[in-house]
Amino acid sequence: MKKIDVKILDRRICDRFPLPAYATTGSAGLDLRACIDEPMVLAPGETTLIPTGLAIHIADANLAAVILPRSGLGHKHGIVLGNLVGLIDSDYQGPLMVSVWNRGQDIFTIEPGERMAQMVFVPVVQAEFNLVESFDTSERGEGGFGHSGRQ
């Protein structure tokens, strides 16, 4: 199994907040915590950047990381990522910040150390483009939206 070296920039990680960890052996994502000293209030419709205390340099062009929302925060409180999904390219070097958006109707308070998002490492395949006159015929053809029905 491939391992990625994630640097810890902030002593609060380990001292005050636990290291990111996979919750179960089957977990794909690591939880990212709000590395802040005091609670932050997020009004309805407001966005803010939350530091995670982590820095990353994947350094392997075959890998990237995606930052995803935590389902409970979005469903129960309307707290989602400001950019919906974050993408970290392999050649990025620097701190991880999470853009958080309160799309709910109520004020939401982000507590120090609260799990705000999750990070998943994914394989990368880059496309090569070829100009062609037509595609090879397939059984599906141009069947698009709803082509297979509802039942």
From Swiss-Prot:
Signal peptide: none
Keyword Magnesium in record: yes
Organism lineage string: Bacteria, Pseudomonadati, Pseudomonadota, Gammaproteobacteria, Enterobacterales
Keyword annotations of the record: Hydrolase, Magnesium, Metal-binding, Nucleotide metabolism
EC number of this enzyme: 3.6.1.23
Protein name (Swiss-Prot/TrEMBL): Deoxyuridine 5'-triphosphate nucleotidohydrolase
Known role: This enzyme is involved in nucleotide metabolism: it produces dUMP, the immediate precursor of thymidine nucleotides and it decreases the intracellular concentration of dUTP so that uracil cannot be incorporated into DNA.
Cofactor(s) required for function per UniProt: Mg(2+)
Residue numbers binding substrate: R70, S71, G72, N83, L87, I88, D89, M97
PANTHER family in UniProt: DEOXYURIDINE 5'-TRIPHOSPHATE NUCLEOTIDOHYDROLASE
Organism expressing this protein natively: Sodalis glossinidius (strain morsitans)
Family: Belongs to the dUTPase family.
A Pfam cross-reference name: dUTPase
An annotated Gene Ontology molecular function: magnesium ion binding
Reactions catalysed, as given in the entry: dUTP + H2O = dUMP + diphosphate + H(+)
Pathway: Pyrimidine metabolism; dUMP biosynthesis; dUMP from dCTP (dUTP route): step 2/2
BP terms from Gene Ontology: dUMP biosynthetic process; dUTP catabolic process
